[in-house]
Amino acid sequence: MADSTRPLLSDFNSSESNLPPPRSLEETIERCIGDFGWAQFLQAALVSFAWFFDAQQTFITVFTDSQPMWHCDNSDRVDSVCNTSSSNLCTLPNQTWSWDLNPHVSIISEWGLQCAGSFLKGFPASSFFLGCLIGGLALSTLADSSLGRKNMLLLSCLIMSLSSMLTAFSTSIWVYAFLRFLNGCGRATIGTCALVLSTELVGKKWRGQVGAMGFFCFTLGFLSLPMLGYINEGNSWRNLYVWTSIPTLIYCCLVRSFVRESPRWLIVKGRKEEAVSILQSIASNAITMSFTNLCFEVENDQSKSNPDVYDALKILVRKSWSFRRLLAAMVVGFGIGMVYYGMPLALTNLNFNLYLGVVFNALSEFPAFLITFFFIDKINRRDALIGFTALSGISSALIAVLGQQLGSLQIVLELVSFFSACTAFNMTLIYTIEMFPTCVRNSAISMVRQALVFGGVFSPVMVAAGRENQFWSYGLFGLIIGLCGLFVFGLPETRGSVLCDTMDEEEYKTLAKRQFIG
């Protein structure tokens, strides 16, 4: 079976006949493109920059949906019933108070939602994450089946940018929530497509570093929002959606014109001439190999003339080993996602300055990125994930044990827990890339990313319960990520492994590894 499924390279020029034939498509591609050159770097950087816009749309509601500050009118009067520090805004007559800034700075003040229930206030944000879940399930397999990585990335960015632009013209919270849902549907596959495409354009030596570039761009996008919010202070919240949508539209044009499709995906789909052309365009200048007679032989796992868009998911579930890997990775992702999305929300439960806490949380993503970038090729994936999930869980549980008396120590533990969750978040995505072959890789990583988002869906409820007792927020955060992290023991180690392209090739590699160990 191994001989019939492994990719082969044939018909070398006579000048290359002294070179041993590569044993896999991975070696063939690395031999073609050579060392990591400028062409590959520019391709990876352009693709990874999609994460920048992804982060902006994920966290933009921090500013657009916030509760504005207000003040009492004529509060110096003896008979005044208004007191900013002790009065409930909803019990005061409208003529006794005013917003500090223009009512159009937030959807809360513009649409008079200050006294609405927590469900209605949070409905747009919930709609966004619901869109992420549905969009991820509905669109993720298209990158493996019919559209490919590049076209799926382009479509996702286009949907996200257009829906963001339309959001600026919302006339009610219901229209606003629907457009946020549509925005989430488009945004759902951006991170996975960008990560998979950027790593498939380079060899395994630089795979981890290139994957970490996307995480760095995501952090930059997150940090760009406070700057935009400061510039827009006192003006309409609609400006933020316009300002973030226009650059995304420009980025779509750049992707359409300059980004190359994954040569791995093209080869698996039988489009070998296009793959050779792309390999030639991104090859290092030092490579002199002739591409004219380059020939790949790859068995297509989806040998159908008209493949179903959900073929990749069917293959993942049909094979017992891939289903076990996917299930374990999703459980790990669920626990990590709950802490990653829940920790910033739970800052309001700590006895610490909220603004400084948010800034520290955002900045803690930088060391998480640096560790991923510089050490991803030096550390075992399983050991690192177990260590970071355990550290995050212990730190989070200690916050609940200490209580609110030690505010400074609590924020230190919170930052340690959030930093560990960020690092585990990054490593989980790279780990998933290495565990699954090209024919199902995008679908697998999309499912794991949906598990991360699904974990975040429960975080707001736990944070609300934790206002009375921190065990229900930080205590459960620590317990869940710690238990979910144990599922890493069911996953294979992938550091330094070759990326496979078909299910049979992955099975052969796993079998050979077991026989070697045995």
Curated annotation (Swiss-Prot):
Cytoplasmic topology: which positions? 1-32, 144-157, 198-210, 260-325, 377-383, 432-443, 492-518
- In residue numbers, the region (Disordered) covers 1-23
Instruction: Tell me, in a sentence or two, what this protein's role is.
Output: High affinity carnitine transporter involved in the active cellular uptake of carnitine. Also transports organic cations.
Expression sites by tissue: Mostly expressed in siliques, mainly in young seeds. Present in stems (cortical cells and parenchyma cells), at the basis of secondary inflorescences, and at the base of trichomes.
Q: Which species does this protein come from?
A: Arabidopsis thaliana (Mouse-ear cress)
Instruction: State the similarity comment.
Output: Belongs to the major facilitator (TC 2.A.1) superfamily. Organic cation transporter (TC 2.A.1.19) family.
Give the way it sits in the membrane: Multi-pass membrane protein
One GO molecular-function entry: transmembrane transporter activity
Q: Where are the transmembrane segments?
A: 33-53, 123-143, 158-178, 181-197, 211-231, 240-259, 326-346, 356-376, 384-404, 411-431, 444-464, 471-491
Which residues are sugar-modified?
N83, N94
The record's Gene Ontology biological-process terms are: cellular response to cold; monoatomic ion transport
Q: Which residues lie on this side of the membrane: Extracellular?
A: 54-122, 179-180, 232-239, 347-355, 405-410, 465-470
Q: State where the protein is found.
A: Vacuole membrane
Among InterPro entries, the record links this protein to: MFS_dom (IPR020846), MFS_sugar_transport-like (IPR005828), MFS_trans_sf (IPR036259)
Q: What is the lineage of its organism?
A: Eukaryota, Viridiplantae, Streptophyta, Embryophyta, Tracheophyta
Task: Tell me the Pfam families matching this sequence.
Answer: Sugar_tr (PF00083)
Its protein name is: Organic cation/carnitine transporter 3
- Residues bound to ATP are S198, T199, E200, L201, V202, G203, K204, K205
Alphabetically sorted, this entry's keywords are: ATP-binding, Glycoprotein, Ion transport, Membrane, Nucleotide-binding, Transmembrane, Transmembrane helix, Transport, Vacuole
UniProt entry tagged with the keyword Nucleotide-binding: yes
What's any one GO cellular component for it?
plant-type vacuole membrane
State what induces this protein.
During cold stress treatment.
